[in-house]
Amino acid sequence: MRIERVDDTTVKLFITYSDIEARGFSREDLWTNRKRGEEFFWSMMDEINEEEDFVVEGPLWIQVHAFEKGVEVTISKSKNEDMMNMSDDDATDQFDEQVQELLAQTLEGEDQLEELFEQRTKEKEAQGSKRQKSSARKNTRTIIVKFNDLEDVINYAYHSNPITTEFEDLLYMVDGTYYYAVYFDSHVDQEVINDSYSQLLEFAYPTDRTEVYLNDYAKIIMSHNVTAQVRRYFPETTE
């Protein structure tokens, strides 16, 4: 486990899933077993206190990002004077509630994704072949954008007008954000690529995320004519 002291009131840590298992917890424990999840977070707090003298005083605010290889957790002490005057028992109860809420939200999000994509996600095939595909795309040109939510993805799928069909595409997701990568054949004119990118930006946003980052940390949830798949499985949204 790697611990970073951000300032007097905030610490950040990253722990791999193998390290989690070495501590007697499983990856599933974190997101499907609330009691075990709480035990894990409290054990981390004890270790942080020992290494960084980060004593639990008053309520804590926690933020968790789950990656393919591990979990990043940011923990901050409240600077609110009223909340700092809470008793230790009240602070502990509030921290437990925050952990429970966090685990519930994470579990709910994962359940929804499973329901939405379990019929179409061939994770074994996609994860096993994505690096091979990346190597095969050396002669292609790539654009990557991000969608803030699934509704934006659906809107793009129904309202876009592709200028060319000479491309491959992948839809990734990480930290609740959707990333859409388009790989154009090498002989496609740059003007066509520019026009396609402009059309994408009517529904999505630029991003500095790279293909390497997405392959390492994101999950492929759709591939091969993403827009057609979205239209097949999701109705058009109405304002």
UniProtKB/Swiss-Prot annotation:
Region: Disordered, residue numbers: 118-137
Known role: Enables the recognition and targeting of unfolded and aggregated proteins to the ClpC protease or to other proteins involved in proteolysis.
Protein family membership: Belongs to the MecA family.
One GO MF term attached to the UniProt entry: protein-macromolecule adaptor activity
Entry comment, domain topic: The N-terminal domain probably binds unfolded/aggregated proteins; the C-terminal domain interacts with ClpC.
Entries under InterPro entries matching the protein: MecA_C_sf, Neg-reg_MecA
Subunit-structure text: Homodimer.
HAMAP family in the cross-refs: MecA
Listed Basic and acidic residues bias regions: 118-128
The protein, known as: Adapter protein MecA
